[in-house]
Amino acid sequence: MTQDFGVYLVTGAEHSAGRSTAEVVEAAIRGGVDIVQLRDKTATARERYEVGTELRTLTRDAGVPLVVNDRLDLAAAIDADGVHLGDDDLPIEVAREQLGSDAIVGRSVSTPDAAREAEQAGADYLGVGAIYGTDSKDTDPEQSNIGLDRIRAVRDATSLPFVGIGGVTPDNAAPVVEAGADGVAVISAITAADDPEHATRRLADAVEGVAPNV
């Protein structure tokens, strides 16, 4: 696929300092975000739908893809561009069958073997981590702080585009791309920033400064 993955925002209302998810996403769009994932583990189904509908309008107007974490039903209901799946979610093949051949289907992995399996199953892209460790998500200790060597190993294992996630900030994003990632995925580096637009722009500058993986 030809989608840019330079700066990938995963929403996190709990980190947004009282701002709405839509406000943060709108600021990130101004800052140059490439793709947005709607993720909210605490909201009700109705709340997720309402936020998703609002984000769908914002992202579509800006030409930025929107994917939904885990929930195929929500992705279909808001006409999202795709879905991002984890270890405990439905298989990639099922997501593809439900959402169609044009849907973007991503998969979280932490090892080269998992990357190969996801590619064989038909994933479009991968999220690899947690690279530096993170407080934004509950991560299995064995999948935390995997480091840049693991990014290099995953790059050797798959031809799929992938983003590195986990503790990424504007100050440490460049080495992730230098190690082989096509971009970086962040939650709090944007959502918790005093100025999400500026934080997004700093991340974009860091990633874009490390061609040719972007």
UniProtKB/Swiss-Prot annotation:
4-amino-2-methyl-5-(diphosphooxymethyl)pyrimidine binds at residues 37-41, 69, 108, 137. Binds 1 Mg(2+) ion per subunit. It comes from Natronomonas pharaonis (strain ATCC 35678 / DSM 2160 / CIP 103997 / JCM 8858 / NBRC 14720 / NCIMB 2260 / Gabara) (Halobacterium pharaonis). Gene3D superfamilies: Aldolase class I. This is Thiamine-phosphate synthase. It holds the Pfam family TMP-TENI. Its EC number is 2.5.1.3. GO terms for molecular function: magnesium ion binding; thiamine-phosphate diphosphorylase activity. 2-[(2R,5Z)-2-carboxy-4-methylthiazol-5(2H)-ylidene]ethyl phosphate binds at residues 134-136, 167, 187-188. It is an enzyme of class 2 (transferase). GO terms for cellular component: cytoplasm. Its cofactor is Mg(2+). It catalyses: 2-[(2R,5Z)-2-carboxy-4-methylthiazol-5(2H)-ylidene]ethyl phosphate + 4-amino-2-methyl-5-(diphosphooxymethyl)pyrimidine + 2 H(+) = thiamine phosphate + CO2 + diphosphate; 2-(2-carboxy-4-methylthiazol-5-yl)ethyl phosphate + 4-amino-2-methyl-5-(diphosphooxymethyl)pyrimidine + 2 H(+) = thiamine phosphate + CO2 + diphosphate; 4-methyl-5-(2-phosphooxyethyl)-thiazole + 4-amino-2-methyl-5-(diphosphooxymethyl)pyrimidine + H(+) = thiamine phosphate + diphosphate. Keywords: Magnesium, Metal-binding, Thiamine biosynthesis, Transferase. Belongs to the thiamine-phosphate synthase family. One of its GO terms (biological process) is thiamine diphosphate biosynthetic process. Condenses 4-methyl-5-(beta-hydroxyethyl)thiazole monophosphate (THZ-P) and 2-methyl-4-amino-5-hydroxymethyl pyrimidine pyrophosphate (HMP-PP) to form thiamine monophosphate (TMP). HAMAP family: TMP_synthase. Pathway: Cofactor biosynthesis; thiamine diphosphate biosynthesis; thiamine phosphate from 4-amino-2-methyl-5-diphosphomethylpyrimidine and 4-methyl-5-(2-phosphoethyl)-thiazole: step 1/1. InterPro entries: Aldolase_TIM, ThiamineP_synth_sf, ThiamineP_synth_TenI, TMP_synthase. Mg(2+) binds at residues 70, 89. The lineage of its organism: Archaea, Methanobacteriati, Methanobacteriota, Stenosarchaea group, Halobacteria. The gene is thiE.
